[in-house]
Regions:
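A short, charged helix-loop
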Residues: 145-165
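Short, small/hydrophobic-biased targeting/export segments
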Residues: 20-147
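Single-pass transmembrane signal-anchor helices and their membrane-water interface zones
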Residues: 1-19
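Short acidic/polar beta-strand-loop edge motifs in secreted extracellular
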Residues: 22-23, 98-102, 161-179
Length: 192
């Protein structure tokens, strides 16, 4: 019995050891795309910070600032999780964007938008809404998550309008000027 318990504990410890880790930072005015060992592509917008950890049984990206467009390689044995402020996004293989600002007008909130496939969004552990039911999003849908982890309503979004920054574009609609200016300044481009 002791041997079986020891093997079980050892197996669990082995599963929890990362097989790959990396940290990424893109300064204002720059963007870049990285490809992970599993084939997943991460397109990081300007002023973005993220940590990547791949395990034997799961894949995780923690965004501490900024915006990333994910093109996740399918792997049913290793789900892909994005941990971002008040939210946790879980996918199998899809294309979606996650935005999080630690400071500024939208401080502490997250926005998830799906270009292809589907994702599940839930409040992060430790938030007031961690036990609430997750939301399932499909292509052409988006939602925001409050700093307390409360999921906002699902809204329609044109898949082609997701991650416009990759095309050198930025779009504002019904956005207060202060919010627009703060978001524009992160691009590092002159406003004239």
């Amino acid at each position: 019995v002791a041997l079986a318990v020891g093997v079980g504990v050892g197996w669990h410890q082995w599963q929890q050891q990362p097989t790959f880790t990396s940290s990424h930072l893109t300064p204002r005015g720059q963007a870049r795309t990285i490809t992970l060992p599993d084939g997943t592509a991460l397109s990081l917008d300007a002023d973005t910070q993220a940590q990547v950890t791949l395990y034997r049984d799961r894949r995780e990206v923690r965004i501490t600032q900024g915006q990333i467009l994910f093109a996740v390689a399918p792997d049913s044995a290793r789900p892909f999780h994005v941990l971002v402020g008040p939210a946790r996004v879980t996918v199998g293989g899809t294309r979606f964007s996650v935005r999080y600002r630690a400071t500024g007008m939208e401080a502490g909130s997250a926005k998830v938008a799906v270009q292809e496939g589907h994702v599940r969004v839930a409040g992060a552990q430790g938030t007031a809404a961690a036990d609430a039911a997750p939301a399932a999003l499909v292509a052409g849908q988006a939602l925001s998550v409050s700093p307390a982890g409360v999921l906002g309503p699902v809204s329609a979004v044109a898949p082609g309008s997701i991650a416009l920054w990759r095309k050198g574009l930025i779009r504002f609609e019904n956005t207060p000027l202060a919010d627009a200016w703060w978001n524009w300044s992160a691009t590092g481009r002159p406003a004239w």
